[in-house]
Amino acid sequence: MKRTYQPSKLKRAKTHGFMARMATAQGRKVLRQRRFKNRAQLTVSSER
């Protein structure tokens, strides 16, 4: 049986990236909370 996590940078960015977060109200809420907590990284797309 193969493992469930098969890493892909493209899929990761499309699902959890900045543009994906901005696309929905709940995603924008996530960004707002992460800014409030002063997270070093807002989204996975800021990994580069």
Curated annotation (Swiss-Prot):
Q: Which GO terms describe its cellular component?
A: ribonucleoprotein complex; ribosome
GO MF term set: structural constituent of ribosome
GO terms under biological process: translation
Keyword presence, Ribonucleoprotein: yes
Q: Known InterPro entries for this protein?
A: Ribosomal_bL34, Ribosomal_bL34_CS
PROSITE patterns of this UniProt entry?
Answer: RIBOSOMAL_L34
Query: Which HAMAP family does the record match to this protein?
Result: Ribosomal_bL34
Q: What is this protein called?
A: Large ribosomal subunit protein bL34
Q: Which organism is it from?
A: Mycoplasma genitalium (strain ATCC 33530 / DSM 19775 / NCTC 10195 / G37)
